[in-house]
Protein backbone atom coordinates (compact mmCIF):
# COMPACT_ATOMS: atom_id res chain seq x y z
CA UNK A 1 0.00 0.00 0.00
CA UNK A 2 2.86 2.39 0.78
CA UNK A 3 4.36 1.69 -2.62
CA UNK A 4 1.10 2.63 -4.34
CA UNK A 5 0.83 5.86 -2.34
CA UNK A 6 4.43 6.71 -3.24
CA UNK A 7 3.73 6.13 -6.93
CA UNK A 8 0.61 8.31 -6.84
CA UNK A 9 2.45 11.18 -5.14
CA UNK A 10 5.37 10.88 -7.57
CA UNK A 11 3.02 10.91 -10.55
CA UNK A 12 1.19 13.99 -9.23
CA UNK A 13 4.44 15.88 -8.69
CA UNK A 14 5.72 14.97 -12.14
CA UNK A 15 2.45 16.07 -13.76
CA UNK A 16 2.43 19.38 -11.88
CA UNK A 17 6.02 20.09 -12.90
CA UNK A 18 5.41 19.23 -16.55
CA UNK A 19 2.26 21.35 -16.86
CA UNK A 20 3.88 24.34 -15.13
CA UNK A 21 6.77 24.27 -17.60
CA UNK A 22 4.42 24.02 -20.55
CA UNK A 23 2.23 26.88 -19.38
CA UNK A 24 5.27 29.10 -18.77
CA UNK A 25 6.34 28.50 -22.36
CA UNK A 26 2.89 29.41 -23.65
CA UNK A 27 2.82 32.56 -21.52
CA UNK A 28 6.13 33.74 -22.96
CA UNK A 29 4.85 33.22 -26.48
CA UNK A 30 1.53 34.91 -25.76
CA UNK A 31 3.13 37.96 -24.19
CA UNK A 32 4.90 38.90 -27.41
CA UNK A 33 8.39 37.85 -26.44
CA UNK A 34 9.20 36.42 -29.84
CA UNK A 35 12.76 35.35 -30.51
CA UNK A 36 14.87 37.60 -32.71
CA UNK A 37 14.94 35.00 -35.48
CA UNK A 38 11.14 35.17 -35.81
CA UNK A 39 11.23 38.98 -35.86
CA UNK A 40 13.89 38.94 -38.56
CA UNK A 41 11.92 36.46 -40.65
CA UNK A 42 8.78 38.61 -40.47
CA UNK A 43 10.73 41.74 -41.36
CA UNK A 44 12.54 40.05 -44.24
CA UNK A 45 9.24 38.82 -45.68
CA UNK A 46 7.41 42.12 -45.18
CA UNK A 47 9.90 44.81 -46.21
CA UNK A 48 10.27 43.83 -49.89
CA UNK A 49 6.47 43.90 -50.30
CA UNK A 50 5.29 47.52 -50.85
CA UNK A 51 1.83 46.94 -49.35
CA UNK A 52 3.21 45.28 -46.23
CA UNK A 53 5.93 47.94 -45.90
CA UNK A 54 3.28 50.68 -46.05
CA UNK A 55 1.03 48.96 -43.49
CA UNK A 56 3.91 48.19 -41.08
CA UNK A 57 6.46 51.01 -41.25
CA UNK A 58 7.77 50.11 -37.78
CA UNK A 59 9.23 46.90 -39.24
CA UNK A 60 10.97 48.54 -42.18
CA UNK A 61 12.55 51.67 -40.81
CA UNK A 62 15.18 53.20 -43.06
CA UNK A 63 18.61 53.44 -41.51
Curated annotation (Swiss-Prot):
Belongs to the conotoxin A superfamily. Residues 1-21 form the signal peptide. It comes from the Eukaryota. Keywords: Acetylcholine receptor inhibiting toxin, Disulfide bond, Ion channel impairing toxin, Neurotoxin, Postsynaptic neurotoxin, Secreted, Signal, Toxin. Pfam families: Toxin_8. Its main location: secreted. The cysteine framework is I (CC-C-C). Alpha4/7 pattern. Residues 48-50 are annotated as: Lacks the Ser-Xaa-Pro motif that is crucial for potent interaction with nAChR. Expressed by the salivary gland. Disulfide bonds join 46-52, 47-60. It is found in: Secreted. This is Alpha-conotoxin-like PuSG1.1. Alpha-conopeptides-like may act on postsynaptic membranes, they bind to the nicotinic acetylcholine receptors (nAChR) and thus inhibit them. Has possibly a distinct nAChR binding mode from other alpha-conotoxins, due to a different three residue motif (lacks the Ser-Xaa-Pro motif).
Amino acid sequence: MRCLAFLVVTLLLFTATATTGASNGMNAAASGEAPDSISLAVRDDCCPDPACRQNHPELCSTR
